[in-house]
């Protein structure tokens, strides 16, 4: 095979090409880390192809809502923490993530946003940092979750400008409660600046959520959790989010936050708009014990993290485990479950033309997956960032 000096051609037993499987196929990656060809294997033309063995090549997973792992958190505001998270995620098939903050004093949020931007610019060793997700401080008390109310703030465009500035224009998403004063103006402002607004930690009614979505909001935060639920006389945040044809629906598929049957109901309503997330915090991949989530001290027992008052406080889910759960609970093909954690997150961020599926012209952010669903290799934009043959697997550590 003729190729450019730094191009590579990988052969796998199957390649998830777009949304369909291609048997015994090769993926050619150019020197820029972009996929230049996906085609059936030909012994003569692909004589130099790197044989990956009996694996499936699939798009890298994208965690669009994650706080931490391995004892580290975005709110640490350090490169070491973000890099540790990045390396850990790569071992589990995640090739990109959105670093998510929590409600905290303004100075701490500013520091976290600034560090996310710096680490994205400087680069990390594993999964790439796509940008920042501001989760809080624009919530309301009734469905606060693990967000301390003393640090809640009122919406003001000037403050939104401040967050954007501290993030060096790397702020991708903002979560807010649509019933707050000034919410619609804030949504319109953020939408005009290309920042995706998610609705959550909210007691808004159906009409308020409909108005927010009409104003430009793009989705709802971890569906069912931290929001007014679905009632036959009051459809609430859940009902509005599931019904709106363009609303992305975040879902934590760990079996603790949402019952599998409720996930099935949501999926039957929103279909491909369901976006698998982890909402994982620093206890992910760690033993049971005490940890911090923002300003809270929390306890993890058997992988479930709770506040002292008994509320859930983030998760210890991995995106790979979430995909497995969806595949099993909803009885959908593995490729369909996988795309809920790769293509749909990319689409929700408006980057589906770059990431989320394996197609010509997109980045070669991809993973080699064995028959037992373990990750063998992970590439980010054509660069090998994890190889199970030389590094320990991590999934066994994760709850």
Curated annotation (Swiss-Prot):
Taxonomically, which superkingdom?
Bacteria
Residues involved in substrate binding: 146-147, 225-226, 233, 254-257, 312-314
Q: Please give the pathway this protein is involved in.
A: Amino-sugar metabolism; N-acetylneuraminate degradation; D-fructose 6-phosphate from N-acetylneuraminate: step 4/5
Report the gene name. manD
Looking up SUPFAM superfamilies in the UniProt record yields: Composite domain of metallo-dependent hydrolases, Metallo-dependent hydrolases
Q: Which GO terms describe its biological process?
A: N-acetylglucosamine catabolic process; N-acetylneuraminate catabolic process
Q: Which NCBIfam families match?
A: nagA (TIGR00221)
Q: What does this protein do?
A: Involved in the first committed step in the biosynthesis of amino-sugar-nucleotides. Catalyzes the hydrolysis of the N-acetyl group of N-acetylglucosamine-6-phosphate (GlcNAc-6-P) to yield glucosamine 6-phosphate and acetate.
The name on file for this protein is N-acetylglucosamine-6-phosphate deacetylase
Q: Tell me its family.
A: Belongs to the metallo-dependent hydrolases superfamily. NagA family.
Q: What is its EC number?
A: 3.5.1.25
- State the needed cofactors, names only: a divalent metal cation
Q: Which residues bind a divalent metal cation 1?
A: 65, 67, 135, 279
Top EC class, one word: hydrolase
Task: Identify which residues the record assigns to the active site.
Answer: 279
**Where does this protein hold a divalent metal cation 2?**
135, 201, 222
What is the annotated quaternary arrangement, including any partners? Homodimer.
């Amino acid at each position: 095979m003729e190729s450019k000096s730094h191009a590579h051609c990988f052969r796998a037993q199957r390649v998830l090409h777009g949304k369909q499987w291609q048997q015994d196929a090769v993926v050619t990656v150019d020197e820029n880390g972009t996929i230049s060809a996906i085609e059936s294997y030909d012994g003569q033309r692909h004589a130099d192809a790197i044989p990956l063995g009996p694996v499936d090549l699939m798009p890298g997973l994208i965690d669009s809502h994650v706080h931490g792992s391995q004892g580290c958190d975005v709110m640490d505001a350090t490169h070491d923490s973000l890099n540790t998270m990045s390396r850990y995620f790569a071992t589990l098939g995640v090739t990109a993530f959105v670093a998510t903050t929590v409600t905290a004093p303004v100075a701490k949020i500013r520091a976290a946003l600034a560090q996310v931007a710096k680490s994205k610019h400087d680069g990390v060793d594993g999964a790439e940092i796509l940008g920042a997700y501001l989760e809080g401080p624009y919530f309301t008390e009734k469905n606060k979750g693990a967000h301390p109310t003393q640090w809640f703030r009122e919406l003001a465009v000037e403050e939104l400008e401040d967050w954007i500035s501290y993030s060096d224009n790397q702020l991708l998403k903002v979560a807010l409660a649509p019933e707050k004063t000034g919410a619609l103006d804030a949504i319109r402002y953020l939408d005009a600046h290309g920042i995706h607004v998610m609705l959550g930690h909210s007691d808004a009614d159906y009409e308020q959520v409909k108005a927010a979505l009409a104003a430009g909001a793009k989705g709802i935060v971890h569906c069912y959790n931290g929001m007014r639920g679905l009632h036959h006389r009051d459809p609430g945040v859940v009902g509005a989010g599931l019904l709106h044809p363009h609303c992305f629906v975040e879902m934590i598929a760990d079996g603790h936050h949402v019952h599998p049957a409720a996930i099935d109901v949501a999926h039957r309503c929103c279909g491909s708009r369901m976006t698998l997330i982890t909402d994982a915090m620093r206890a992910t991949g760690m033993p049971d014990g005490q940890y911090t989530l923002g300003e809270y001290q929390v306890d993890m027992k058997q992988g479930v993290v709770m506040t002292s008052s008994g509320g859930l406080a983030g998760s210890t889910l991995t995106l790979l485990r979430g995909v497995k759960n969806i595949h099993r609970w909803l009885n959908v093909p593995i490729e369909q479950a996988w795309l809920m954690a790769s293509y749909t997150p990319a689409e929700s961020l408006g980057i589906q033309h770059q990431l989320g599926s394996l197609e010509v012209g997109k980045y070669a952010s991809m993973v080699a997956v064995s028959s037992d669903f373990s990750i063998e290799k992970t590439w980010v934009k054509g660069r090998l960032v994890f190889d199970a043959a030389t590094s320990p697997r991590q999934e066994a550590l994760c709850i």
